[in-house]
């Protein structure tokens, strides 16, 4: 037995008890006649004492050779600690060591294994196994485990069954790029790694497994944006014989359960917002509703004056920012430069200061009088001491720019409190979106999403107006889950493929197995998938998902610890009948 207790459980009730501990040397303090060592494991830190007058001489001298991160086993007696440490659970005691074995030595770590480390992100990624020893990373992984356990418990109590689906599947060109896997046994043919278990969970519904879930790895070979991973984890769920309301209620319940059990927070019924309302009011389909700054459209009061910029714009839209009416011209100019960056893309910005005396001062006073500006303030909800920022241009583009500004200002003003949780449902998404590059419609979610029955007649005449039986759960400005009611009959699915530009042959080749299954009594069904990595990070109060993943990739999709991806041997390529063309 390497240990009788862990390094986080001993206290004053164990005084005079003989114990065995094992762990890593955090640090040591040599006072000549006495030596203290902090021993660390996953559970905490226990102080060891080596006393020249009470410890075996060999053990005492051996303690002087210990370096950081040495792995040791000690035996000794629990004694009361003279200088108590209230910051750790074992701070009332220490161990008078009688025996010690060095289980393994260690090189000096390339960064300090402390809560606040001197290691940059790159070096910590390279030595991730050392980074995991640090409390922030370790605690993040333990928190992820708790979330996963609560999910499994909640869904299992509702008779959901966890079923594993295949990782080696068929490639489908629709959507993001697949990671492909060559098949040695089937020359010239390839598997794909799943972007989601979508079709398999639908087939499970056809198979009668009416409540399915899975915590599953998914893969997308796409250009990585900040804080994205090529492999990610979903809480994937599907149910048969349900309508949209059933799914919203169950998974709202799951989220409320997680908030209560893990954060001690009771949340009221989630508000619901249509996609169109979210886009018009917040400029995106995942609004952060922890704070206000809702959009006010100013076309009625800003156009048809003498200001050519607004007159030429499709949309003039603004937000009122609380408490920044005293911003200096330098601060305002810096914000204008911020929105003009390529990442945002605005051509400029108009501002209006709402003075305490009820008057207004703007950058366009030449064109608009106090009455006009009063209408702007009323439309945006601006009060004395606030400032109104106005953007103009093409409607969709301008809303996106103002949304970026809204989020940036909220961050600067401390309005995005990570300890506050504001969930909502966004519903009634468009079924289709038009892609200018390809010149055809694409499914906004995926090709298996059911249109709202009352909009079916619009598919031929006005496809962009067809709404989907689709829904997203949004938490603090992040989409943490999304799903839909699925198409469950062959004819409707064939019609959907047609509107998405598939030929009959293409549809049959890619999804014939699903179409065939629909001919054998497919039940009405629908589902949802949560992004576990993002959900855990938000519940854990962090901006980045990386610390909640044991071995993440960097922003280039590389694992710098194991140096992957890597070149494979020519013999392997030959065996797979693959010839590289890297010109």
UniProtKB/Swiss-Prot annotation:
PROSITE patterns: AA_TRNA_LIGASE_II (PS50862). GO terms for molecular function: aspartate-tRNA ligase activity; ATP binding; nucleic acid binding. The keyword Nucleotidyltransferase does not apply. InterPro entries: Aa-tRNA-synt_II, aa-tRNA-synth_II, aa-tRNA-synth_II/BPL/LPL, Asp-tRNA-ligase_1, Asp-tRNA-ligase_1_N, Asp/Asn-tRNA-synth_IIb, AspRS_core, GAD-like_sf. It is an enzyme of class 6 (ligase). CDD domains: AspRS_core, EcAspRS_like_N. Coiled coil: none annotated. GO terms for biological process: aspartyl-tRNA aminoacylation. It is found in: Cytoplasm. Keywords: Aminoacyl-tRNA synthetase, ATP-binding, Cytoplasm, Ligase, Nucleotide-binding, Protein biosynthesis. It catalyses: tRNA(Asp) + L-aspartate + ATP = L-aspartyl-tRNA(Asp) + AMP + diphosphate. It comes from the Bacteria. NCBIfam families: aspS_bact, PRK00476.1. Catalyzes the attachment of L-aspartate to tRNA(Asp) in a two-step reaction: L-aspartate is first activated by ATP to form Asp-AMP and then transferred to the acceptor end of tRNA(Asp). Homodimer. Belongs to the class-II aminoacyl-tRNA synthetase family. Type 1 subfamily. This is Aspartate--tRNA ligase. It comes from Flavobacterium psychrophilum (strain ATCC 49511 / DSM 21280 / CIP 103535 / JIP02/86). The lineage of its organism: Bacteria, Pseudomonadati, Bacteroidota, Flavobacteriia, Flavobacteriales. The gene is aspS.
